[in-house]
Amino acid sequence: MDVFRTTNLTTSRQGSSGAAYGGLIFAQALAAAENTVNETLKPHAMHSFFLLNVDTALPVQYHVRRVRDGRSYSTRTVEAIQEGKIVFILQVEPDAAIHQEEMPNVTSWKELKCLTEVLSWLRTEIAENRIVVKPSVERYIRRFERRTDEKIRDLFEIRPCNIDQYIGVGEMSTSRTFYSWFKALGCLGDCEKLNRYLVAYNTDATMAGSAFRPHFVNDFQPSMILSLDHNVWMHQHLMRADQWMLFENTSTVAGRGRAFTTGKLWNEDGTLVLSCTQEIVLRSRGIVSSI
């Protein structure tokens, strides 16, 4: 068994000060697995389960089990251990793609603004009654504002294709499909693994939103949102996290306190880079919304 240890668990993405961002744990576990296989083998299928909250104040050990090693395939199982308890499990396998879905025809990132750029404009519109928002949306906006006020800088810039739909202002929509462009800040260079890990890190950022944002129309206020599992299939080995990519997120079903979401990621030239799925816990202390 190979063991890797980290104390770097704090990011701007975490929902609370003591709970680690799931995408970070996923990316670190992937890095640990890749460190135990031949350089010629690239990760394709990754299946993970979030078992317990990961405390950012405590170190995590990643235990990598070498399940199978062959000339063309290897399988690794990674267990994230904190205080003797398994908090996260990831299984990694390689594979290849033979066809792909076409990239959707959406607005280019060049014509869009990032979330931080629209906050001041949005506050002015609300103050002058040109935009009226529901309490659930007001709470959501304040969350973004707190991050800006505290000068918390994300690793990525995200530009939603429909900012009104993304935040829940303007003409309300019940669409459960959302499109966003994203890229990492700064230049990452040609390190294949670093780019891959950062792309994996970011896949956990927006998927849950496709489940609860459509319910803003009913003033739905989620009281708990957390990932139960996260699965990624990488169709391309070479990817640049510091170049613009289009992320499509869709929620196909929600009920009984859970929701299922899917994601597809294209690079700017239309190549499908990866597909992913996620099941989340989605709860509210307020109204029950149905759309």
Report each predicted region and the residues it spans.
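Terminal targeting signals and extreme-terminal segments of soluble enzymes
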Residues: 1-291
